[in-house]
């Protein structure tokens, strides 16, 4: 019997088995030891028609807590930002609706130009010479930057601040383990990197120094001083940065960063749990040929018309295989398009205004919480800051959910020393009323 959605009949199965020379499905898996194979039938419910199935799925979806149902003060790498309506309209067009970067430029000029614009805007925001077409997310961008540094310097020691997002550091450790690289983590002092410890750790074997700006605790690192520590050494200076903050903050390129990486989720990509993000990777011209991922370049055809092509492809794994700069090639072209459309819709003034509202609203919330007697950790911050509570953050967040709020990130999940510490994010979407109500609620729960 054929199935509406699984068109594999018994006749189809028989024909396929005859083609590969087996008599049963079990023979197909004979290399798997029988003792570890599942025996019997799977406990799968009977199939449903479309209407009751949709009803069941909707009931499951309604259990989710989202920024549409609750007011969110959660950040830590994924943020609730304004997304211009035009973003979904553009990325839903069939011409664009793919994550794949095109190999045939003559039929893909629109998509190639969109990627080129993404690269251009990222390079401008970061103050760097060039940027690639995108990476999987901020974590892979961060780890790939370390791999580039190790390959370029031929050193194997990676120095990374513990003020970098812990998930990015976890990805870095995964990359480093397989290549027998040494990762040295530098402690945090007063919500920023311990500069004395960082300076002492740098030696002739160091491939790179890696920090985040603004860092995981929301604080602004002293990039100028950190860059000075690498002068006279082979070590590259790598900065992971929230690109929206660079509409307001001095870009890392102006401090002499060699590589700037991060996550473009803040531009046009909804906050979700485990869904696709869009990493970015920017570099100096000196390191351009060692960058991972696709690069779109501008050129002219034989009639003198402007055109766009995938360029410097000899770096990539589909040509050089084991000698490629990275295994990353096609990845997040669709989300890069979303980020491009969002940045274009906002414009320079809009990105500045968005970043400024984040800063001002976060500062308002910080000052109000200090006035109310909360212990707010000191530091110059952007749109996130740390508050120490009298009770476990998990308990406070559970109570906040019942009141219609998504609380901040529980830093106790990162390190025990941050037990009862909450990382609070304030974006341009939060109103004064929401901020004041949140403070009142946590004041009661913290008593």
From Swiss-Prot:
Keywords noted in UniProt: Oxidoreductase
EC number, as in UniProt: 1.4.4.2
GO molecular function terms noted in the UniProt entry: glycine dehydrogenase (decarboxylating) activity
InterPro entries in the record: GcvPA, GDC-P_N, GDC_P, PyrdxlP-dep_Trfase, PyrdxlP-dep_Trfase_major, PyrdxlP-dep_Trfase_small
Keyword Oxidoreductase: yes
Gene Ontology BP annotations: glycine decarboxylation via glycine cleavage system; nucleoside metabolic process
Reactions that this protein is recorded to catalyse: N(6)-[(R)-lipoyl]-L-lysyl-[glycine-cleavage complex H protein] + glycine + H(+) = N(6)-[(R)-S(8)-aminomethyldihydrolipoyl]-L-lysyl-[glycine-cleavage complex H protein] + CO2
Listed SUPFAM superfamilies: PLP-dependent transferases
Any Pfam family: GDC-P
Keyword hit for Chaperone: no
Protein family: Belongs to the GcvP family. N-terminal subunit subfamily.
Record function comment: The glycine cleavage system catalyzes the degradation of glycine. The P protein binds the alpha-amino group of glycine through its pyridoxal phosphate cofactor; CO(2) is released and the remaining methylamine moiety is then transferred to the lipoamide cofactor of the H protein.
Subunit annotation: The glycine cleavage system is composed of four proteins: P, T, L and H. In this organism, the P 'protein' is a heterodimer of two subunits.
Name of the protein in question: Probable glycine dehydrogenase (decarboxylating) subunit 1
Organism from which the protein derives: Macrococcus caseolyticus (strain JCSC5402)
């Amino acid at each position: 019997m054929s199935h509406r959605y699984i068109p594999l009949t018994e006749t189809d199965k028989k024909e396929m088995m005859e083609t590969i020379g087996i008599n049963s499905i079990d023979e197909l898996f004979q290399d798997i030891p029988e003792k570890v194979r599942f025996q019997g039938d799977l406990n799968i419910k009977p199939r449903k028609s479309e209407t009751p199935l949709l009803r069941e799925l909707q009931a499951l979806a309604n259990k989710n807590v989202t920024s549409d149902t609750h007011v969110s003060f959660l950040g830590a790498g994924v943020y609730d930002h304004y997304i211009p309506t035009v973003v979904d309209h553009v990325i839903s067009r069939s011409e664009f609706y793919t994550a794949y970067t095109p190999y045939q430029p003559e039929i893909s000029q629109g998509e190639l130009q969109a990627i080129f614009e993404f690269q251009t805007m990222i390079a401008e925001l970061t103050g760097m010479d060039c940027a690639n077409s995108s990476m999987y997310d901020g974590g892979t961008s961060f780890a790939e930057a370390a791999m580039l540094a190790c390959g370029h310097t031929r050193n194997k020691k990676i120095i990374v601040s513990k003020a970098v997002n812990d998930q990015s550091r976890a990805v870095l450790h995964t990359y480093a383990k397989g290549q027998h690289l040494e990762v040295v983590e530098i402690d945090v002092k007063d919500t920023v990197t311990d500069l004395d410890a960082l300076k002492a750790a740098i030696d002739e074997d160091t491939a790179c120094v890696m920090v985040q700006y603004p860092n995981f605790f929301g604080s602004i690192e002293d990039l100028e001083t950190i860059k000075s520590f690498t002068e006279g050494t082979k070590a590259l200076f790598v900065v992971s940065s929230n690109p929206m903050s660079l509409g307001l903050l001095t870009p890392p390129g102006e401090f002499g960063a060699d590589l700037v990486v991060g996550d473009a989720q803040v531009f046009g990509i909804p906050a979700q749990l485990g869904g696709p993000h869009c990493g970015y990777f920017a570099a100096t011209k000196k390191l351009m040929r060692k960058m991972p991922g696709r690069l779109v370049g501008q050129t002219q055809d034989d009639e003198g018309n402007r055109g766009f092509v995938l360029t410097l492809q000899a770096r990539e794994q589909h040509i050089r295989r084991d000698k490629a700069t990275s295994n990353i090639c096609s990845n997040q072209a669709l989300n890069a398009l979303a980020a491009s459309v969002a940045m274009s819709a906002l414009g320079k003034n809009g990105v500045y205004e968005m970043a400024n509202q984040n800063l001002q609203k976060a500062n308002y919330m910080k000052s109000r919480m200090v006035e109310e007697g909360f212990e707010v950790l000191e530091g110059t911050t952007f749109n996130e800051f740390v508050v120490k509570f009298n009770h476990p953050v998990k308990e406070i967040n559970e109570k906040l959910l019942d009141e219609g709020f998504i609380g901040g990130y529980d830093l106790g999940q990162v390190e025990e020393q941050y037990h009862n510490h909450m990382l609070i994010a304030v974006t341009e979407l939060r109103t004064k009323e929401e901020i004041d109500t949140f403070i009142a609620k946590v004041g009661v729960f913290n008593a």
